[in-house]
Amino acid sequence: MIQQESRLRVADNTGAREILVIRPLGGSVRRSAGIGDVVVATVKEAAPGGTVKAGDIVKAVIVRAKKETRRPDGSYIAFDENAAVIIKANDNDPRGTRIFGPVARELRDKKFMKIVSLAPEVL
C-alpha cells in the first residue's frame, strides 16, 4: 500500500523520475492507496528538459505496487516496484505520451483507458 511520504518511480515520459506522495485522494481519513488510486504528489527528481520539474505539485495514478492486490477470481498480483503515471489535474488523461513497463488490469476497471492503451503490457 502507498501512503503519505511514499516515494514512487514515475513510469512515463514527462521528465519526472521520482515523486513523493503528499496525500491519497478520496476521503479526509484515507490513509493508503493501491493500484488504480489517485494521489497528490510532489516531484522530487526530474530530468532536465521535461514537462515537469522538481518541486511541482502533480496528480498521479498508481500503476504498480509491491503490496499484492487481490482479484475477483482469487488470484493476486504484485510488482517489484511502486510506480505511478502523472495525470492532468482536470481529467484522467496522462500528461506524458509514453508509458514504461507493465500496468495492472485494475486500471481498466477504474476508467484509465488512455493509460491502458499506451502501456506496452497489461497484466
Swiss-Prot record:
HAMAP family: Ribosomal_uL14. SMART domains: Ribosomal_L14 (SM01374). One of its GO terms (cellular component) is cytosolic large ribosomal subunit. The keyword Zinc does not apply. Transmembrane segments: none annotated. The gene is rplN. This is Large ribosomal subunit protein uL14. Part of the 50S ribosomal subunit. Forms a cluster with proteins L3 and L19. In the 70S ribosome, L14 and L19 interact and together make contacts with the 16S rRNA in bridges B5 and B8. Belongs to the universal ribosomal protein uL14 family. Keywords: Ribonucleoprotein, Ribosomal protein, RNA-binding, rRNA-binding. GO terms for molecular function: large ribosomal subunit rRNA binding; structural constituent of ribosome. Binds to 23S rRNA. Forms part of two intersubunit bridges in the 70S ribosome. The keyword RNA-binding applies. Gene3D superfamilies: Ribosomal protein L14 (2.40.150.20). One of its GO terms (biological process) is translation. It comes from the Bacteria.
